[in-house]
Amino acid sequence: MLEAYRTHIAERAIQGIPPEPLSAEQTADLVELLKNPPTGEESTLIDLLRNRVPAGVDQAAYVKASFLSAITTGDVTSSLVSPVEATEILGTMLGGYNIEALIACLDNDDLAATAVTALSHTLLMFDAFHDVDEKAKNGNAYAMQVMQSWAAGEWFTSRKQLEDKITLTVF
């Protein structure tokens, strides 16, 4: 899988275009490599997981989120990705297949603070908003932190302030 993807990267570089993101099949192969990483490929595997799998609701994102979710629950282990790191990576997926796993992490004291940070900056919640709300109403302090963060608009206010002047060209 790694050699084939490296060949793909080289072919695209010759054309002056970036490589395509990993497909669901390539992501599944990557997951297997992450479970038993070949020596010397550790940083490449992590880079592919973090940066070459599409976020959101792509099938590759489903494979990625399922793998990371399984790490957070302890069903799967990887010497390269701890449960906290898995939660952090889930938080970079913007919304979609990662949401259910992040909400579940609110019930795990070891992962909840990381999940709060991730969910506080995630807007694409759809109906899962109600799951967080329900947890907060049932006394989950971490879910309450997420709700308070959303109410305060931290997803917006935590971003870098815009420049005083922005020059644009409109056609």
Give the predicted meaning of each segment:
Residues 1-36:
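Amphipathic alpha-helical packing elements
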Residues 4-8, 29, 44, 66-67, ...:
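Exposed alpha-helical structural elements
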Residues 37, 74, 78, 107-110, ...:
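Structural signature of alpha-solenoid helical repeat scaffolds
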